[in-house]
Design a protein with these regions (language model features):
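Hydrophobic side chains in well-ordered alpha-helices
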Residues: 17, 24, 55-58, 243
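Conserved helicase motor core of SF1/SF2 NTP-dependent helicases
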Residues: 42, 104-116, 122-232, 236-338
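Conserved loop-to-helix interface motifs that mediate assembly, gating, or partner/ligand docking
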Residues: 86-107, 111-114
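Short, surface-exposed acidic/glycine-rich loop or hinge patches that mediate macromolecular interfaces
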Residues: 11, 22, 49-50, 237, ...
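Interdomain "pre-motor" coupling segment immediately N-terminal to P-loop NTPase/helicase cores
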Residues: 37-96
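Short glycine-/aliphatic-rich beta-strand segments at the starts of folded cytosolic domains
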Residues: 1-16
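Compact, well-ordered interaction domains used in eukaryotic information-processing assemblies
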Residues: 26, 32-35, 41
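Short amphipathic alpha-helix segments
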Residues: 13-30
C-alpha cells in the first residue's frame, strides 16, 4: 500500500476538484482503485504504487485547471481519466480555450478534447476537411459552429448543409407528404444544430433570405457554390458518384466540411461508400485534411463512449472471419431449368 500527499494552494480549488457531493473524486477513486481523503488543504491518495501514482496525476491536473479558473465537469473528469491511463494528462491543459461561436442562449462553443481541437484547427486551416468519427464526438455540431462563426464574420455569404436523403433503403418518392415533409426527418439533426446556434427566429430569417440552405445531396448537382460554407453530413452513405459530384461543387471563397462514420454505412452491399473512397483518394492532397476522432473524443453520456468502444472492438475482431469466409465459400452454381 502506497500513500501520496498533495497540497492545494487554496481550499476553494479543492471544492472545484471534488465537485458536487464529491462526485469527481469518486470517479477518480473508482477509475484507479484508490482511496482519497482530505484535511484542510491536504489530500492523501492511498492504493498500490501504480494506482496511487495515477490518482495523484489526475488530481494534480484538476488542481491546475482549478487554479486557472476552468470549469470542471463530469465530461472533463472522464476525459482526464482516459488521458492519465495513456500517460497524456498534461494535454488536458493544452486544449484551446478559444470560443468558436456563442449559441443563441449565450453558451460558448469550444473544443472539449484534443481530438476536437485538432478537428477545429483543420477546418480553419484547410479548404476541405473530412471528419471521420464515431457517434457522439461532436463532428457535425462543431462543423456547424465553424460555419456560423464564418457567416457572422462575413467570410462567407451562405451556409449550406446537406446529407444523403436515402438511408436504410428508403426512397423519397415512397414517403408521404410534399418534398419538405419527405426530407425533414433526414435533415433534422442539421436543423437542431442551427436552431441551437442561431435560435429559431434568426434561423427562419436567414433561411427566407437564402443565407441558409438545408437540402438533400441530390440538390447540389449542377451547381457551383461560391462564398459558401458547405457541410456534407452522414457522408458514409454517399456513393462514389455522389461524393465526386459534391466535391466538384466547390467554388471560389468557399469551404467544405465532410463528416461521417465509416462504421455506420447503410448503403446496399454492392455500393462503395463515397466517404471511404475519398479518404483513400484524397489523402495527402494539398489543402485537404482528413481528421479522425476516436471513442476518447465522445462527449455524450459515458455509456455512449463504452458502446462505441465495444462496437469498434467487435468490428475489428470480425474482419479476419469475414475475410476468411469470403475465400472459403463455395461459388453457387446455377441450375439449368427446362
Amino acid at each position: 500500500m502506497t500513500e501520496r500527499t498533495i497540497n492545494a494552494e487554496r481550499v476553494e480549488q479543492l471544492i472545484d476538484v471534488f465537485g458536487s457531493f464529491d462526485e469527481n473524486i469518486r470517479k477518480i477513486e473508482d477509475a484507479f482503485g484508490v482511496r482519497i481523503t482530505n484535511r484542510n488543504n491536504e489530500l492523501k491518495v492511498s492504493g498500490d504504487e501504480e494506482a496511487a501514482d495515477k490518482g495523484c496525476r489526475a488530481i494534480e491536473a484538476l488542481l491546475a485547471l482549478a487554479a486557472k479558473g476552468e470549469e470542471i465537469d463530469e465530461q472533463k473528469v472522464r476525459y482526464l481519466i482516459n488521458l492519465v491511463n495513456t500517460g497524456n494528462e498534461d494535454q488536458v491543459s493544452k486544449i484551446a480555450k478559444d470560443v468558436v461561436c456563442v449559441t443563441a442562449k449565450g453558451r460558448p462553443v469550444k473544443a472539449k478534447t484534443i481530438g476536437q481541437q485538432n478537428y477545429l484547427k483543420a477546418i480553419e486551416k484547410n479548404t476541405i476537411t473530412i471528419g471521420v468519427a464515431p457517434a457522439g464526438t461532436g463532428k457535425t455540431y462543431l462543423a456547424v459552429a465553424e460555419a456560423v462563426a464564418a457567416f457572422r464574420a462575413k467570410t462567407v455569404n451562405r451556409i449550406i448543409l446537406t446529407r444523403p436523403a436515402v438511408e436504410a433503403g428508403e426512397r423519397l418518392g415512397f414517403l408521404p407528404g410534399d418534398l419538405q415533409n419527405k426530407v425533414d426527418p433526414y435533415l433534422r439533426p442539421l436543423y437542431d444544430a442551427l436552431f441551437d446556434m442561431l435560435g429559431p427566429e434568426t434561423y427562419g430569417k436567414y433561411l427566407e433570405r437564402g443565407n441558409i440552405e438545408v437540402a438533400p445531396l441530390a440538390y447540389m448537382r449542377g451547381r457551383t457554390l461560391d462564398d459558401s460554407f458547405i457541410i456534407l453530413d452522414e457522408a458514409q452513405n454517399t456513393t462514389r458518384e455522389q461524393m465526386k459530384m459534391f466535391l466538384t461543387r466547390l467554388g471560389f471563397g468557399s469551404k467544405i466540411v465532410i463528416t461521417g462514420d465509416i462504421t455506420q454505412i447503410d448503403l446496399p452491399g454492392d455500393k462503395v461508400s463515397g466517404l471511404k473512397e475519398a479518404i483513400r483518394v484524397l489523402d495527402g492532397v494539398e489543402d485537404i485534411q482528413i481528421c479522425r476522432l476516436t471513442p476518447a473524443d465522445v462527449v455524450r453520456h459515458v455509456l455512449v463512449q463504452r458502446i462505441v468502444a465495444a462496437y469498434d472492438k467487435y468490428e475489428k475482431s470480425r474482419l479476419p472471419d469475414d475475410h476468411a469466409r469470403k475465400f472459403t465459400q463455395k461459388p453457387q452454381t446455377k441450375r439449368n431449368l427446362k
